[in-house]
């Protein structure tokens, strides 16, 4: 017997007996439905030898199931006018689809089939390793991406939060079907999954549909607790003479995702560098003309977080940009934020 935990406005939550959580939000007037299958396990759960495997499995789930080929997965979604995508983060993996409500069952069947019955064939792995290696090269060619990776590596140097989500060429080349299947078997279990639907959806009917497909999944073993994370503020530099610009990251620790004060962090992020009206954009780009891109970004995790400011400028104006950023930080620390702002 499934148990309804929450019914607030149009949002309803149910947990199946095997631990699988289902959340729906009914949106009156909508004719479409957005589906999400969320895994509470990203690159942070990997060992050093496994680094990149969460992202690689995300790719491999599109490479055919016991019931569908790669082409059939793509064709069936296109045939119903649907859309599907996936992404891997440091603490989650997401598979999502959007379709008209009349095709919701078909879209969910495709997503759940990918998640429950992947093939992990060696011949597919060889091709996908090539794809991911090209993705890594693309990141290596991006100064902005490398600045972010350098920050993570140094800031969380003793935790997997500091590792790249894509992994390294060495780890990606080492993956094999048995390794993928074992990792998938440990992590893709009901207690670690969340199913969501928003749009034209009736909660009871959606729960019944999910239960019929995934209610028989075995619980699996609970994942071990994550180690306590520490941060290491420091100065780090990486030189690449072929580039025209210097990329800058200035970051500080923030509250974790579930902290009561996180909303203040979101507001601070918006005021500092969240858009064209932000202080950093208006002062350093619009008034001084020192940069093209400048923004701030908030990265919140279960037990850690960081607020980072990113900018790109000519090497000759780097000191002025750093000085201007620090001036804005001192200003927001020492002076009140106006009601209008």
Label each residue range with its predicted role.
Residues 27, 36-38, 222-279:
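His/Glu-based metal-binding/catalytic segments typifying zinc-dependent metallopeptidases
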Residues 1-32:
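N- or domain-start disorder-to-order transition segments that initiate the globular core
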Residues 39-40, 197:
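A secondary-structure boundary/capping signal
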Residues 41-51:
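Short pre-active-site segment immediately N-terminal to the catalytic Zn-binding motif
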Residues 9, 15, 26, 63, ...:
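Charge-rich, well-structured scaffold segments of protease-associated domains
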Residues 279-287:
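Short amphipathic alpha-helix segments
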Residues 52-65:
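Active-site SXXK
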């Amino acid at each position: 017997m499934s148990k309804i935990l929450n019914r607030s406005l149009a949002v309803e939550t149910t947990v199946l007996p095997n631990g699988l959580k289902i959340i729906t939000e009914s949106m009156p007037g909508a004719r479409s439905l957005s589906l999400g299958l969320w895994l509470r396990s990203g690159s942070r759960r990997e060992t050093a030898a496994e680094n990149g495997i969460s992202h690689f499995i995300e790719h491999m789930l599109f490479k055919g199931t016991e019931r569908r080929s790669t082409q059939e997965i793509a064709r069936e979604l296109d045939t119903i006018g649907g859309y599907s995508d996936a992404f891997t983060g440091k603490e989650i993996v997401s598979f999502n689809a959007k379709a008209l409500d009349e095709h919701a069952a078909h879209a969910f069947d495709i997503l759940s089939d990918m998640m429950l019955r992947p093939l992990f064939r060696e011949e597919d792995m060889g091709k996908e390793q090539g794809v991911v290696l090209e993705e890594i090269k693309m990141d290596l060619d991006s100064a902005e991406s490398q600045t972010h990776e350098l920050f993570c590596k140094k800031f969380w140097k003793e935790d997997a939060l500091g590792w790249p989500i894509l992994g390294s060429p060495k780890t990606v080349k080492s993956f094999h079907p048995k390794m993928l299947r074992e990792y998938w078997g440990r992590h893709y279990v009901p207690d670690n999954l969340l199913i969501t639907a928003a749009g034209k959806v009736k909660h009871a009917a959606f729960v019944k549909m999910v239960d019929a497909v995934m209610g028989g999944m075995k619980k699996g073993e609970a994942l071990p607790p994550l180690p306590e994370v520490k941060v290491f503020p420091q100065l780090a530099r990486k030189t690449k003479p072929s580039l025209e610009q210097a990329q800058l990251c200035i970051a500080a620790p923030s509250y974790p995702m579930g902290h009561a004060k996180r909303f203040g962090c979101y507001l601070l992020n918006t005021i500092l560098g969240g858009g064209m009206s932000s202080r950093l954009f208006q002062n350093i780009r619009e008034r001084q003309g020192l940069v093209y891109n400048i923004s701030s970004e908030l990265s919140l995790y279960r037990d850690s977080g960081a607020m980072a400011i990113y900018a790109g400028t000519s090497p000759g104006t780097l000191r002025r940009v750093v000085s201007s950023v620090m001036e804005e930080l001192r200003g927001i620390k020492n002076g009140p934020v106006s009601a209008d702002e």
